Amino acid sequence: MATVTSAAVSIPSFTGLKAGSASNAKVSASAKVSASPLPRLSIKASMKDVGAAVVATAASAMIASNAMAIDVLLGADDGSLAFVPSEFSISPGEKIVFKNNAGFPHNIVFDEDSIPSGVDASKISMSEEDLLNAKGETFEVALSNKGEYSFYCSPHQGAGMVGKVTVN
């Protein structure tokens, strides 16, 4: 890469004739132009910036992976009344997203007799009167205590719409 640090410009002298004058007139001028140096960009500096961007991206991906969620469909694609998957395992604090897949009214109630001791089922469940009526509606919960949790859809529990999650 070429850089310009300074340049000198000389204007040649001019000898001109004036009417009625026999003496030589001399005009001489010189000017010095200096340009400020351009900032030097180096591969080393730009690689440093790229490296910082890569580290930031990797860190945000690791943070996001710790906050992963599992999706559980309420109603199978074939129309059956089921949680899909009906049994699964998660890590403590991992979010479960229950999503109405069919448009039938569903809810998620954790069975107070089939959850770890010390866990309040009412704090992790929907009320039995609340329903996810439309396709795409969701209910989210994060379970912190290790153990097995049984849950059901109250309108369809008799039809076998039950599930179990294990927090490892």
Curated annotation (Swiss-Prot):
The crystal structure with reduced Cu(1+) has also been determined. Disulfide bonds: none annotated. It comes from the Eukaryota. Belongs to the plastocyanin family. The keyword Membrane applies. InterPro entries: BlueCu_1, BlueCu_1_BS, Copper_blue_Plastocyanin, Cupredoxin, Plastocyanin. This is Plastocyanin A, chloroplastic. Participates in electron transfer between P700 and the cytochrome b6-f complex in photosystem I. Pfam families: Copper-bind. It comes from Populus nigra (Lombardy poplar). NCBIfam families: cyanin_plasto. Keywords: Chloroplast, Copper, Electron transport, Membrane, Metal-binding, Plastid, Thylakoid, Transit peptide, Transport. It is found in: Plastid, Chloroplast thylakoid membrane. PANTHER family: PLASTOCYANIN MAJOR ISOFORM, CHLOROPLASTIC-RELATED. The keyword Plastid applies.
